Amino acid sequence: MTDTAKYEKSSARCWICYEEYDKKLCSLSNDSWRRPCRCSLIAHESCLISYITRSGSTRCPQCLTAYRIAKPPKEKSWAVNVLGIGHSLEAGLAQVTFGVGSCLGITKFIYSIFKQTGIWICKQVADESSLIEMLKKPVFSSVVLPLLPCMLVRFYEAPPYDIAFSLYTHFSIYSCAEKISNTSLLLCTLPWVRSLYKELMTRIFDGIVIGADGEFEDSETDWFRQFEAQVEHRNQVEDVNEREDTESEFWILLSVAHVFLDAFTTKILRIVRPILLFPLAGKFLGRFIPGNFTKLEKSIIGAFAALVFKDIFVYGFIAWRKRKPWSIRILDNPRRVSDS
């Protein structure tokens, strides 16, 4: 065993299956011979794999040299590779198509809702003949109509530092009309008038307008916190054994209803309110405006007047709330009063 050259020339056998090494047969056989260690022990590759699988050892039993194990090379035909690539592309395209189709379906649904809402708004403030002429223009029917509800929401909020969106919509309206009229000029000046109006109201009410909506919400929150504090104080004073389950359930339902109504009014109605009420208020108040104005011009002036009346009412109510804060009373338990 010490003379390696003599061992290789005389009788080289697989140390696992004891088959003799034949160089001619080795070139014809698919099972190649391996010499993975330093002690010149050779073996078939299949025999080595079987030995490693059965014993769980990856070292030579004689010299304890660790075998170098590598993944076999992939020997697939081009047809199999093409089928694999096609299967991967099919799965990927199915996922992408489903995602894109879902997004397009949701977008189309929202777009149709906004477009129908825009048509309803135009019917409230414009004549039918002028509306038919405007709908014949592709830019107006496909771009401007879906933007009208968004324009009303932006104009209703109307921060002085963000009027680009409203200006874009207004310019789209009169560019589709292919002429500059009094109505188009009035539409273009609405954001600037709203900004000046906001600044004027701020000067008049001396700080009441600034953060009025947030202050109103804070006052409502303080009101509810005061309400909860009194309820908690009452529950602490009362004896736990004398509480009735119906009363506790009533206060829980009242708290849940208040939270739900608060979320509904502040989130949903804040968006729906200007879209629905703004055109209707303009249509109603526009009837009382004298002069040779068109229906659309009267509707715009009436809507702006409704906005002014709304702001005056809200700011006046907030000023009154500041001077006369609300107070809440929780009545005592009638049973406890009679016992005392």
UniProtKB/Swiss-Prot annotation:
The chain crosses the membrane at residues 249-269, 274-294, 300-320. This is Uncharacterized RING finger protein C32F12.07c. Zn(2+) 1 binds at C14, C17, H44, C47. SMART domains: RINGv. GO terms for cellular component: mitochondrial outer membrane. It holds the Pfam family RINGv. Keywords: Membrane, Metal-binding, Transmembrane, Transmembrane helix, Zinc, Zinc-finger. A zinc finger (RING-CH-type) spans 6-70. It comes from Schizosaccharomyces pombe (strain 972 / ATCC 24843) (Fission yeast). One of its GO terms (biological process) is regulation of mitochondrial fission. GO terms for molecular function: ubiquitin protein ligase activity; zinc ion binding.
